[in-house]
């Protein structure tokens, strides 16, 4: 019987994460047979891309890798020759030479218009909450501001300002750049425009198939590792970060940005990356992890939002971040669709290892969305048990007791699955992995103490309260140089922290002083000084 493309694809999917001899042989046979089939310009192509990416990242031998990469090239060539209609049918698929249509932040679009691998232009203003006239009132030269009051729609305003169609996106971005010193004002008005752009790849580089980090060596799999000593891995000393040339760093940064842009997503640490904070660790089993913080004007009060991208044999396989405050971190993980069904637990533990050692974190907390709250996939996959198996426990004692009972059934009764109602109950509480002896303080607890302090001691007068706590802190710091705008902001935050946490000793005040000086300059030094202040 002659097998069709979809049947062969399903057969390949059934063996792609198996590494016995028979399965390895089957992968080769299915890939060779699929290579004789025409490339379908439909959702099956996207599904095939996912399987090929999994095989490239988890190949068992060189022959499988070569065949998978050859199929990626064949798909790319077919799509390059495809008609505009055929490509448009695959919009937002991330396949080579297919368009993407989405909204992005001003900052990322500023980067995109300089990226040489794509053409980019305005598609539409879709359900804008604020029109262009209102926004440009803040930026246009005073002689032209009168135009913004003449009831022009967005298209009409651009015409009266005589902006050529091909320059309209760069014009809008340039105007909003005038608000860079007021980033949150800029964000509000720019995001409210609901400006949709269309990205047309010039070559295969802007695609999920070829958005990868160059490799010196490839790790070939003999198995998908499920069982390992988690604690030993978390405590295994990290290697030194990889030294990158300016060119290498630019390449990796491009891969990181494109990995999310191809999904029509962004995270703040990727979009507002502080390049000085970037570190890349090359770890076991083909895993590399990049971590990075945010520019000073985008940083959060007291805590540090540190993003990551995890690579598997050079392919971006997971992204997310940690909100780090002292020994505590709120952790989130998102595994890109092609790489699910692989070594998810090992990948997560490698991430925890990096944050544990780079920042001294010994308490990781995960919010319920990750395992089902407002996330049906998290419920259907039983994601709660993924975290449970790696030591995470519900913060609510009642739920923890229920989990113990359910997990015992899972171990004792073959095929037992928790009901949907039970899994939804687990989403009523965060889960946490506690590696130290104490549960560390949260930023929310500091915030609540500050609110209570201002209310009780200053009758809610926040201006007065800030002046007093800053004055008290400065008096304890022996010498302090002229502070920048960002350092003054940090001084206010840390002064309130000192007041409500009763930080008075000379050594801790010295640490607080260093926090003020380093937060906008050195993510890692800031964290070390914060740990010292909270000790």
Question: PLM ranges: what are they?
Answer:
Residues 1-143, 412-535:
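Long, compositionally biased intrinsically disordered regions
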Residues 48, 104, 115, 126, ...:
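Sequence-level detector for tyrosine residue identity
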Residues 90-159, 300-327, 332-339:
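Contiguous N-terminal and early-domain "leader" segments and peripheral loops that mark the onset or edge
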Residues 111-255:
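Long, charge-dense tracts
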Residues 137, 146, 155-158, 168-179, ...:
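Acyl-donor binding region in acyl/amide transferases
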Residues 241-340, 349, 353-359, 492-503, ...:
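A conserved beta-strand-loop-helix scaffold within acyl/acetyltransferase catalytic domains
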Residues 393, 401-422:
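Long, charge-rich alpha-helical interaction segments
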């Amino acid at each position: 019987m002659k097998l069709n493309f979809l049947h062969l694809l399903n057969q390949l999917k059934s063996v792609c994460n198996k590494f016995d001899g028979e399965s390895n042989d089957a992968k080769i046979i299915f890939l060779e047979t699929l290579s004789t089939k025409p490339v379908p310009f439909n959702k099956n192509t996207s599904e095939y891309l996912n399987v090929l990416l999994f095989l490239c990242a988890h190949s068992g031998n060189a022959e499988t890798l070569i065949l998978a990469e050859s199929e990626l090239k064949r798909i790319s060539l077919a799509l390059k020759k495809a008609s505009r209609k055929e490509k448009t049918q695959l919009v937002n698929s991330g396949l080579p030479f297919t368009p993407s249509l989405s909204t992005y932040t001003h900052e990322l679009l500023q980067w995109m218009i300089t990226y040489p691998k794509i053409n980019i232009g305005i598609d539409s203003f879709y359900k804008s909450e604020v029109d262009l006239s209102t926004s440009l009132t803040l930026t246009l030269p005073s002689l032209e501001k009168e135009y913004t009051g003449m009831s022009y729609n967005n298209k009409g305003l651009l015409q009266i300002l005589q902006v050529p169609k091909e320059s309209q996106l760069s014009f809008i971005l340039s105007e909003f750049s005038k608000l860079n010193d007021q980033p949150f004002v800029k964000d509000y008005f720019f995001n409210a425009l609901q400006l949709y752009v269309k990205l047309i790849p010039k070559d295969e580089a802007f695609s999920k198939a070829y958005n990868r980090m160059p490799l010196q060596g490839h790790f070939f799999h003999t198995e998908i590792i499920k069982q390992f000593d988690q604690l030993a891995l978390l405590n295994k000393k990290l290697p030194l970060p990889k030294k990158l040339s300016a060119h290498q760093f630019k390449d990796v940064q491009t891969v990181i940005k494109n990995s999310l842009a191809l999904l029509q997503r962004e995270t703040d640490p990727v979009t507002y990356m502080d390049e000085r904070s970037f570190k890349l660790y090359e770890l076991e089993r083909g895993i590399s992890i990049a971590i990075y913080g945010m520019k000073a004007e985008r940083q959060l009060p007291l805590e540090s939002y540190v993003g990551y991208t995890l690579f598997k044999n050079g392919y971006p396989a997971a992204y997310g971040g940690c909100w780090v405050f002292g020994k505590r971190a709120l952790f989130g993980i998102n595994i890109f669709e092609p790489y699910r069904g692989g070594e998810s637990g090992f990948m997560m533990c490698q991430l925890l290892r990096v944050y544990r050692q780079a920042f001294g974190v010994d308490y990781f907390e995960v919010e319920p969305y990750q395992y089902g709250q407002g996330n049906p996939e998290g419920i259907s996959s039983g994601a709660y048990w993924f975290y449970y198996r790696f030591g995470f426990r519900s913060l609510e004692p009642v739920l923890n007791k229920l989990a113990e009972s359910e997990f015992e059934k899972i171990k004792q009764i073959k095929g037992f699955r928790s009901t949907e109602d039970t899994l939804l109950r687990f989403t009523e509480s965060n889960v946490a992995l506690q590696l130290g002896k104490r549960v560390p303080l949260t930023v929310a607890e500091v915030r609540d103490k500050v609110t209570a302090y201002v209310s009780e001691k200053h009758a809610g007068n926040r201006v007065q309260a800030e002046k007093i706590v800053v004055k008290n802190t400065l008096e304890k710091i022996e010498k302090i140089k002229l502070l920048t705008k960002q350092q003054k902001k940090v001084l206010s935050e840390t002064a309130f922290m000192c007041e409500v946490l009763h930080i008075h000793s000379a050594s801790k005040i010295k640490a607080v002083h260093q926090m003020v000086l380093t937060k906008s300059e050195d993510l890692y030094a800031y964290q070390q000084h914060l740990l010292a202040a909270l000790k």
